[in-house]
């Protein structure tokens, strides 16, 4: 869908990588491995994004590490577009409706790290949740966005953020009762 507006596949991948989850960082060689594209093409797009102020960089050792510039005036708009593109807005909308005492919903896995995937992994945290209703809402969301959704449910006492933080993973808080 967004590929129609933005013809560069590398640019779309970079938008997904950095604007879906603002805590994601990456350096050129890691992007080359992840995207399976040449460093030259990726470098050109990174330079354009950096010059426009969409991403920031810092040197860590001998690596130049990039991340989204969350202070950019268009950051929130781009983030919302990317969320809609991958269907996360529908997932959260469907889950939050009449679900019970929902506390938090996290995005984990490849999508949380800005990688393209047909599977959305979420973690649902709450008390006395209506699990049959949750399953029904997830199935509705899957049909609407044409992606598979895998979920894990934790009660508030069972949940520990460290459990869902694997090395190199950046869980993305999609919804919180405290918001």
Can you describe what each PLM-predicted range is?
Residues 1-13, 19-47, 51-99, 112-117, ...:
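Catalytic core of pol beta-like nucleotidyltransferases
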Residues 123-125:
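Short hydrophobic/aromatic beta-strand micro-patches
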Residues 107-111:
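Short helix-loop-helix/strand-helix junction enriched in hydrophobic and basic residues
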């Amino acid at each position: 869908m967004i590929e129609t507006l933005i013809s560069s596949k590398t640019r779309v991948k970079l938008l997904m990588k950095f604007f879906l989850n603002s805590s994601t960082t990456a350096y050129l060689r890691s992007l080359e491995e992840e995207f399976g594209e040449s460093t030259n093409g990726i470098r050109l797009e990174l330079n354009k994004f950096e010059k426009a102020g969409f991403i920031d960089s810092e040197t860590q050792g001998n690596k130049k590490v990039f991340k989204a510039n969350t202070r950019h005036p268009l950051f929130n708009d781009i983030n919302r577009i990317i969320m809609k593109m991958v269907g996360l807005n529908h997932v959260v909308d469907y889950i939050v409706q009449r679900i019970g005492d929902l506390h938090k919903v996290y995005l984990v896995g490849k999508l949380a790290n800005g990688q393209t995937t047909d599977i959305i992994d979420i973690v649902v945290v709450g008390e006395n949740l209506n699990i049959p209703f949750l399953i029904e809402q997830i199935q509705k969301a899957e049909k609407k966005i044409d992606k598979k959704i895998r979920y894990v449910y934790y009660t508030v006492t069972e949940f520990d953020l460290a459990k869902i933080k694997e090395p190199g993973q950046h869980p993305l808080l999609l919804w919180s009762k405290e918001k």
